[in-house]
Amino acid sequence: MDTPPLSDSESESDESLVTDRELQDAFSRGLLKPGLNVVLEGPKKAVNDVNGLKQCLAEFKRDLEWVERLDVTLGPVPEIGGSEAPAPQNKDQKAVDPEDDFQREMSFYRQAQAAVLAVLPRLHQLKVPTKRPTDYFAEMAKSDLQMQKIRQKLQTKQAAMERSEKAKQLRALRKYGKKVQTEVLQKRQQEKAHMMNAIKKYQKGFSDKLDFLEGDQKPLAQRKKAGAKGQQMRKGPSAKRRYKNQKFGFGGKKKGSKWNTRESYDDVSSFRAKTAHGRGLKRPGKKGSNKRPGKRTREKMKNRTH
């Protein structure tokens, strides 16, 4: 006869009943404390089963000769220049600082050296060869495929470093190029401003030459210094002022130099009669040249033809 499956509520009630029973048993044994609803497990006790350990050791222990085992237990070799017998060490005090990498590696090296010095004579007595034959092929610990991968990885890393270095150099060159370009543009602007100032000075008569047209290749600072020095040394009116004085006179009061005096009134040496009566102003022309007849004459001539 098949029993119907239990519902979720019935299964939860059975689990709760089992849990309650366990809690009651634990409480009766004194494993529960006030405020706890979980059984606390006590700390595990360490068992030192000496007989069991010896039995396990006897199962895999083999009495082999030393040449098959090649085990030695030695201390480090004495340091160079020190006493041959190793100095007694205190067990409580460590001879080598484990945090010092150099001392730790040197202790490994000295201990291996002591083992080699102690084992080689025994191997020679047992006639065990300690040197490899000339045709011995020693296979590497790592395969060629793995070494090839390591080589490719190193090459990739080196190529990445070279690309990074080239990128740094290109950035530095671009930065330097921008700096040089900016300096060139500033120099051109300064030269242009100097040229415009020279043109303005030439137009106003402050200068009688244009340096940039004469191919003056001196630096701008020297030209400015020379121009300022020339202006300080130059005395007298400018070229523009001299031209205007020549054309229009000096202007202002002439101190009576052009007033009529007795001497100037009596001086008739420069008098010309033809010029005074207007005869000298006429231009000589061809005598008997044909002139256009007047309006009435032209009308009479026209009526005659009709």
Curated annotation (Swiss-Prot):
It is found in: Nucleus, Nucleolus. There is a cross-link at residues 94, 179, 218 (Glycyl lysine isopeptide (Lys-Gly) (interchain with G-Cter in SUMO2)). The modification Phosphothreonine is found at residue 3. Keywords: Acetylation, Coiled coil, Isopeptide bond, Nucleus, Phosphoprotein, Ribosome biogenesis, Ubl conjugation. GO terms for molecular function: RNA binding. The modification Phosphoserine is found at residues 7, 9, 11, 13, 16, 264, 270. Residues 1-20, 77-99, 213-306 are annotated as: Disordered. Residues 274-306 have a biased composition (Basic residues). GO terms for biological process: ribosomal large subunit biogenesis; rRNA processing. Ubiquitous. Its main location: nucleus. The modification N-acetylmethionine is found at residue 1. The keyword Ubl conjugation applies. GO terms for cellular component: chromosome; nuclear periphery; nucleolus; preribosome, large subunit precursor. The keyword Cell inner membrane does not apply. Residues 138-169 form a coiled coil. Specifically interacts with EBV EBNA1. The EBNA1-EBP2 interaction is important for the stable segregation of EBV episomes during cell division. Interacts with WDR46. Required for the processing of the 27S pre-rRNA. Belongs to the EBP2 family. This is Probable rRNA-processing protein EBP2. The lineage of its organism: Eukaryota, Metazoa, Chordata, Craniata, Vertebrata.
